[in-house]
């Protein structure tokens, strides 16, 4: 088992356990400055406090930040590729001076740690975007950097009170110290870690088992359950999948643990970061995938990263990382032999192969299409179908646009009456909302349960509009409407017909 990065596992929870009560009292005092941690900061601080980000013991000061951005190293020369920063707004930054102590809270209620400030600085975000994320403004991390993150960073050391509170899967959330003890108790000194933010299927099981056998090692399934790429499948669905698929491994070869990481999708730099984290968790080997941690393509169809950039950068640091890199070897299904094999060992001009892309899988889930057993296990498909029901079982919402001149009440009643005659498999409701933005979540709950909503009035403030949310469709005369009317005073019967045909075309009704 490799030593932690930097030589010492920086478990701040264990280090500060004896002064926890003292720190708790300080955090709850009325005269201490308080910062409520953002979702990304909560992920980052958990991995600082539990040692997953060893050798870090706090958020980066300006010297360390600048060195990481430009040279992929901390100021002392230690390899570190991603800046871990506490971003705040200008108003909060103006309250801070060196040596200020700040209580860091989760959800404004749970004290997590106290930060002793070393410095407050305004980063050059343009340089950070270019050096760390290669500068494409469409990169999700660059969008976050300029549109979400605060304009000032606070550097300083942390004293731990407790880890962020999670109410799901407590038995699967092993800290680095706990996972290292688990490996020791099992006498696993060689462990291949597998990083994923997606559901796993038979090909993933095959490639991880092959990697373990080639390395004479065991397998750590170590999925990210913090922040991933926008649009990814939710972690609850994925964890249920992982819990099922791990049963398909040979007995005693695999272990599942969840990683509360906020991914940056920064490709090659992130792959090095992932390797460091897995070393801290006790893994001796790490599978680096094709286009590892890349966000795919931009709107022009150009890849943000090359397919092998990550593998090449991690390999270039292998002597410093002290963890063996296992290149991801894509496997494909051979239907004539009913087995999987590495695609680089197959002559595809002579051997028939089958594969289902992620896009095709999502399409089949959406329309209720067949997902063959050679691709995924039945229990995995069942979980995915429960979380991604086909369109006839999904809910929807029809928002009546502001330009309509027909009676909204009568149109709503006409739509409701028409929908009800199609059968009782879906709940319908006319939803008058009275400009209450907090009802947005309620609308999504109705849609998520497979119901059909009719919303006679939009919110006046566009930022609070439901239009544009998943399965929410605007009925209006505007060119941006999902269901476009030729005129504001079309007869109600014509409008109802257009709505029904639209919903049928999009799979909500099957006649």
From Swiss-Prot:
Sulfate binds at residues 195, 197, 293. Residues 394-511 are annotated as: Required for oligomerization. GO terms for cellular component: cytoplasm; mitochondrion. It catalyses: sulfate + ATP + H(+) = adenosine 5'-phosphosulfate + diphosphate. The active site is at residues 196-198. Keywords: ATP-binding, Cytoplasm, Nucleotide-binding, Nucleotidyltransferase, Transferase. GO terms for molecular function: ATP binding; sulfate adenylyltransferase (ATP) activity. The record marks 201, 204 as: Transition state stabilizer. Induction: Expression depends on the formation of the MET4-MET28-MET31 and MET4-MET28-MET32 complexes on its 5' upstream region. GO terms for biological process: hydrogen sulfide biosynthetic process; sulfate assimilation, phosphoadenylyl sulfate reduction by phosphoadenylyl-sulfate reductase (thioredoxin); sulfur amino acid metabolic process. Its EC number is 2.7.7.4. Residues 168-393 are annotated as: Catalytic. The record marks 328 as: Induces change in substrate recognition on ATP binding. It comes from the Eukaryota. Pathway: Sulfur metabolism; hydrogen sulfide biosynthesis; sulfite from sulfate: step 1/3. HAMAP family: Sulf_adenylyltr_euk (MF_03106). Catalyzes the first intracellular reaction of sulfate assimilation, forming adenosine-5'-phosphosulfate (APS) from inorganic sulfate and ATP. Plays an important role in sulfate activation as a component of the biosynthesis pathway of sulfur-containing amino acids. Present with 1510 molecules/cell in log phase SD medium. The oligomerization domain is distantly related to APS kinases, but it is not functional and does not bind APS. It is required for oligomerization of the enzyme, although the oligomerization state has no effect on the catalytic activity of the enzyme. This is Sulfate adenylyltransferase. It comes from Saccharomyces cerevisiae (strain ATCC 204508 / S288c) (Baker's yeast).
